[in-house]
């Protein structure tokens, strides 16, 4: 009886085959990185773990970031943070008679360990979003300028400055934690200030306006090393309020005052010393009033705009209050 003979293969030549997951395409990796700003390695890992499904990969990354972020935050939590940014956000900068409009603004200081991270676009976006969130939650209180509780702010849902209508993806605190995981440095929210005023009564004789200026900006004109907010009080020149031309000149005056506060060692509004705003030469105001003491220049400007009849009429345009912050400066006790 004949038998079919087959060669016997050595056991070492036997192989088992299985279907390996498809390698994530460069297009999917790029799309995921664009939406999350994770590294290429992390994007590939997320897609591989999610069978190349973008939405599933986003969920995977969110869970991974929560875990790694908490570990990283705990690891770097004791490190000193002396660098960073001051960020300003203004939702509404004036009150006006007859308009149901109040002032809403905020200024925050966000710190990190190095100037390198302080200049990072991701860090700058975080600072801007936190300032915007602070302005959104601002409510009028006993004074127009108020310190905002950091605990309250960190528990608030983070509102995107660039897309404020989008649903928040987390709180201020969780977003700081996630950013720590991405940049590898400790990040701390040092202080927050809100400016809030209700719309004035219909027969109000004074308007409020808020000026701002940030020095040492990097990615946005509202984020830098030094920031200031300055509140102005103005008498109405007539029951109809200000003309369009005067309003435009007011905007220039506000910016000049804010720049003056930042550019000089300004510590108070009135007084005889050089740290008093009204005694300083108004170097930041262009035109014929340049170099006159700020207090005198404001009175002369009011006459030029027809707000008052003579420079002897006090209180036509006043700086009522200001806040000036520098990154890393000592805080008042």
Swiss-Prot record:
- An example of a Gene Ontology BP annotation on this entry? mitochondrial translational elongation
Q: Where in the cell is it found?
A: Mitochondrion
Q: Which Pfam families match?
A: EF_TS (PF00889)
Q: Where is the transit peptide?
A: 1-17
Q: Which PANTHER family match?
A: ELONGATION FACTOR TS, ELONGATION FACTOR TS, MITOCHONDRIAL
State the name under which the record lists this protein.
Elongation factor Ts, mitochondrial
Is the Ion transport keyword given for this protein? no
Organism classification, top ranks? Eukaryota, Fungi, Dikarya, Basidiomycota, Agaricomycotina
Name the InterPro entries for this protein.
Answer: EF-Ts_dimer_sf (IPR036402), Transl_elong_EFTs/EF1B (IPR001816), Transl_elong_EFTs/EF1B_dimer (IPR014039), UBA-like_sf (IPR009060)
Cysteine disulfide partners in this protein: none
**What is this protein's function?**
Associates with the EF-Tu.GDP complex and induces the exchange of GDP to GTP. It remains bound to the aminoacyl-tRNA.EF-Tu.GTP complex up to the GTP hydrolysis stage on the ribosome.
Where does the protein principally reside? mitochondrion
**Designated gene of the protein:** TSF1
Mind telling me which GO cellular component terms the entry cites? mitochondrion
Recite the UniProt keywords alphabetically.
Answer: Elongation factor, Mitochondrion, Protein biosynthesis, Transit peptide
The organism's superkingdom is given as Eukaryota
Q: Name one GO molecular function term.
A: translation elongation factor activity
Report whether Transit peptide shows up as a keyword of the record: yes
Describe the family membership recorded for this protein in Swiss-Prot or TrEMBL.
Answer: Belongs to the EF-Ts family.
């Amino acid at each position: 009886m004949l038998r079919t003979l087959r060669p016997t293969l050595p056991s070492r030549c036997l192989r088992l085959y299985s279907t390996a997951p498809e390698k994530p395409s460069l297009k999917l990796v790029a799309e995921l990185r664009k939406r999350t700003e994770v590294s290429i390695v992390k994007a590939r890992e997320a897609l591989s773990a999610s069978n190349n499904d973008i939405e599933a990969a986003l969920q995977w990354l969110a869970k991974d970031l929560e875990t790694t972020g908490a570990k990283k935050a705990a690891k770097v939590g004791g490190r000193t943070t002396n660098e960073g940014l001051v960020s300003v956000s203004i939702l509404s900068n004036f009150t006006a008679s007859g308009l149901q409009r109040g002032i809403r603004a905020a200024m925050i200081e966000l710190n990190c360990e190095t100037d390198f991270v302080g200049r990072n676009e991701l860090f700058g976006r975080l600072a801007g979003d936190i300032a915007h969130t602070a302005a959104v939650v601002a409510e009028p209180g006993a004074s127009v300028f108020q310190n905002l509780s950091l605990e309250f702010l960190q528990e608030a849902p983070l509102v995107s400055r660039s897309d404020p209508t989008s649903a928040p993806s987390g709180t201020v605190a969780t977003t700081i934690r996630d950013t720590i995981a991405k940049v590898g440095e400790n990040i701390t929210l040092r202080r927050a200030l809100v400016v809030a005023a209700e719309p004035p009564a219909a027969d109000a004789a004074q308007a409020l306006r808020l000026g701002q200026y940030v020095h040492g900006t990097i990615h946005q004109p509202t984020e830098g090393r030094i920031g200031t907010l300055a509140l102005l009080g103005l008498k109405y020149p007539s029951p109809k309020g200000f003309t369009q031309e005067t309003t435009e000149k007011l905007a220039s005056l506000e910016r000049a005052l804010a720049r003056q506060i930042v550019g000089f060692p300004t510590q108070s509004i009135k007084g005889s010393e050089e740290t008093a705003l009204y005694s300083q030469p108004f170097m930041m105001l262009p035109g014929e009033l340049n170099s006159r003491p700020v207090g005198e220049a404001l009175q002369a400007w009011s006459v030029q705009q027809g707000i008052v009849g003579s420079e002897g009429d006090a209180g036509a345009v006043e700086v009522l209050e200001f806040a000036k912050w520098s990154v890393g400066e000592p805080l008042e006790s």
